[in-house]
Regions:
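Phosphate- and other anionic-substrate recognition elements at nucleic-acid/protein interfaces
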Residues: 1-173
């Protein structure tokens, strides 16, 4: 399939546990569909058209609390689930580090800004930044609540994957 083929779709996935989400864009970057983790079965109807799925990588850090590690282990399961869905459908699944796609959209907080924020406050600000960017790019997307930040991330990750594919920066894509 050529990039200009209007049937090509791009899937972006934030494999978060409670706030995870996904987004599907067409070859022009227009919104096709999006949803929270619990609505993942809607993705199946598009699998034949999806060219590339871009999935946010999950990291477990040595300084994580037990609660954080448990949450991250569930995200790792979701990451593996999405890779299985994509692999089973013959869709190329490309991992992307959170800092990489967020840098592309100018959403990374600088270290000095992070230190000024209270613990937990940085997560809320990051979520609001993602929502604002996604709302600006796709005003018709249902992104009404802060808990929709995973959907916003999914859409932004899909756009990142679409742009990378367009620039031929994914090997073998």
């Amino acid at each position: 399939m050529r990039f200009t083929d209007p049937s090509i779709l791009f899937l972006g996935i934030d494999p978060g546990v409670t706030a995870g989400g996904w987004g599907i864009l067409d070859y022009r970057g227009a919104l096709v569909d999006c949803g929270r983790w619990g609505t993942w079965e809607r993705v199946r109807r598009y699998l034949g058209q999806i060219k590339i799925a871009t999935i946010e990588m999950i990291q477990v850090r040595s300084d994580d609390t037990m609660e954080k590690m448990f949450s991250r282990s569930a995200m790792i399961e979701n990451y593996g689930f999405w890779q299985g869905v994509c692999g089973g459908a013959g869709v190329s699944a490309k991992p992307v580090h959170p800092r990489t796609w967020k840098k592309y959209f100018g959403l990374n907080l600088r270290p000095g800004e992070l230190k000024m924020l209270k613990r937990g406050g940085a997560d809320k600000i990051k979520a609001e930044m993602s929502l604002a960017k996604a709302r600006a790019l796709w005003p018709t997307a249902q992104l009404k609540y802060l808990k929709d930040n995973g959907v916003a991330d999914g859409l932004l990750i899909a756009e990142f994957g679409r742009a990378r594919h367009r620039q031929n920066l994914f090997e073998g894509a």
